Amino acid sequence: LNQTFQNFEIIIIYDDLDLFDLDYILEKQKIDKRITVIKNNKNIGAGFSRNKGISISNGKYIAFLDCDDCWHPEKLEKQLNFMKDNKISFSFTSYDVINSKGEIIKNKKAPKKIMFKNLLIDCNIGLSTVILEKRLINDSCQFPNLKTKEDFVLWLKISKKTDLYGIDVSLAKWRKLNNSLSSNFFQKLIDGFRVYNRY
């Protein structure tokens, strides 16, 4: 909520069977009418939850923020200005990797541009850094049902339509937790084989 650019809506897809923080979120919704909360009746996974959020969104642009991550206060303003000034439809930024205490342990730099062939070699795109035009998402181009790498699959599909542009400024923080799906080496390996076999 603490962004210098304030013309946005927040769509929270609650996909956790543990309801420990749902009341807090609903209280925030009462205070700020820009917030919409959708609680899934059953766990459908991150990819399908994001698709659901995108489908009910109203804006021209879509940005993502996972629950463990956080944005720099100027992220939306700087990134949207960059996209409008350069007439591009997909952008991402550098980001800091932090531990459970919030300490920066490394910085991931964003390359200036990524094309499909580059993306197959290495995905340097942090999900919570991405802003894209909603028109890029449709029934044949959306998040798949994978436990990990679902964002990688979508970026591959989009990179066949347009180049992906990076901003080498850290505008987000990604929290690395040892028990998170994004940190699960074996699950990432399995899903990685599935992705590469398909593309």
Regions found by a protein language model. Give the residues of each.
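Acidic donor-binding segment of Leloir-type glycosyltransferases
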Residues: 1-39
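Conserved short acidic donor-positioning loop in nucleotide-sugar-dependent glycosyltransferases
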Residues: 13-17, 44, 67
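Acidic donor-diphosphate engagement hotspot in glycosyltransferases and nucleotidyltransferases
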Residues: 21-22, 50, 71-76, 101-102
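Glycine-rich, basic loop-to-helix element that forms the pyrophosphate-binding segment
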Residues: 40-57
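Short aromatic/hydrophobic "clamp" motif used to bind/position activated sugar donors
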Residues: 62
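The conserved acidic donor/metal-binding loop of glycosyltransferases
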Residues: 66-70, 94
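Conserved donor NDP-sugar-binding/catalytic core segment of glycosyltransferases
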Residues: 74-105
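Conserved nucleotide-sugar donor-binding catalytic segment
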Residues: 107, 111-188, 195
